[in-house]
Amino acid sequence: KIFKRFASLLTIFILTIMSIVPVHASENTSVVNVTDDLAIQMAERFAKGIVHIGNIVANNPRKFYDTTGQAIGYIVNYNLENKPYGYVVFDTTCESLISEYSFGNNSANPYEVIYQSEANVFSEKANTSEIYKIAPFEYGIVDNLGKIRTNYGETLEKTVLSLNESRGKDPATWDEVLLDIDEVYENYTLVSTNHLQEFISFNEPYIESVTGHYACAVSALLACGAYYNAVDYTDIAGDYMDIWDSTGTTVSSESGGITYGSTTIGNIGPGFVDFCAGKNVSVTQNTDYSPNYNFFTNCIDRGDIAVVHCGIISSDTGERAGHSMAAEGYATLRAYNSGNTVHTLMVFDGWGDTVRYLNFDFDSWTDISGTTFNG
């Protein structure tokens, strides 16, 4: 069995990857999108340069993610004469681009180690579950109970993941989970509802024009701040950037002169409380990483505002896209055609000015969490 890590692989792998992926000039900002097929091709070339054994076949590439839900690499298996014969882990966070590899009849990759040792706590869908890199050489899968099982035999709380990180660019696929008000009137009957007396919004073009910045969580909190009379309408830019700073929002990209930001969910509630305190407004917060519908309706019913954070798999990129929105009401709807009931949150979506209805029952959320305020 051969097992080595990091340094010895650097030269070999650089030569391997250069033979597969074209090298761009430094001023070219193009990003190579590594596909399953390319991961297999990379793995096979790597194996041929290391093992010098014929008939090794790479297969079953499995994408893995960092703790924020961003794809960072692949685990690829090897077969020799139709029998398992090791694996390689490509990891873009490692300098060598390979974090580990192993060849041999008894080599099990991190995913297999977890699933084989803890099979009784995983659902039937576990074989398609996402695997997360928790630490160097440690990986985890979320089990039936919402716990993370790792290849080191540890059981961790799901809160070690920050999958709810909110990113501030508008993916087109959000139209699938957000209903416009005219669509609601046309296709649904209202079962029950409650909402704040005033709908507050600051559309994205306006925010970008006055601040040169945009982050969905910051825009959502600006609406919350306005609701609690903590916003100075003569200095929207100043308040926006104060919220940006108090929540630890970081730059995720820049485009067209606009700086886009990313905010970790765990910072949103406390950061907003600090912002309000600076305005002599007393507000408390509660963040739930697995809220039910009542978590939001109870907040609205007592006359407070909330922020919903959710993630989907973008049909454009195949990757998770996250978004945070101010929840200013709720509505249970019944579809005219099917009679199905839909639970929605009435949200300021961060992009436009009008209320939209977020389908809380959407069955393909990658994650959904919330922050409620009391003030």
Could you describe each region identified by the protein language model?
Residues 17-31:
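Sec-dependent signal peptide cleavage junction
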Residues 72-79, 138-143:
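Short beta-strand elements that form the blades of beta-propeller/WD-repeat-like
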Residues 40, 44-59, 64, 104-131, ...:
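Active-site-adjacent structural segments surrounding the nucleophilic cysteine of cysteine proteases
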Residues 69-76, 300-308, 342-346:
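Short, hydrophobic/aromatic-rich segments at coil-to-beta transitions
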Residues 124-127, 132-133, 144, 292-294, ...:
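Active-site signature of cysteine proteases
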Residues 8-19:
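Bacterial N-terminal signal peptides
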Residues 223, 251-333, 337-340:
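Predominantly the structural core of cysteine protease catalytic domains
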Residues 33, 78, 82-124, 295:
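Long, charged/polar, surface-exposed segments that mediate recognition or autoinhibition
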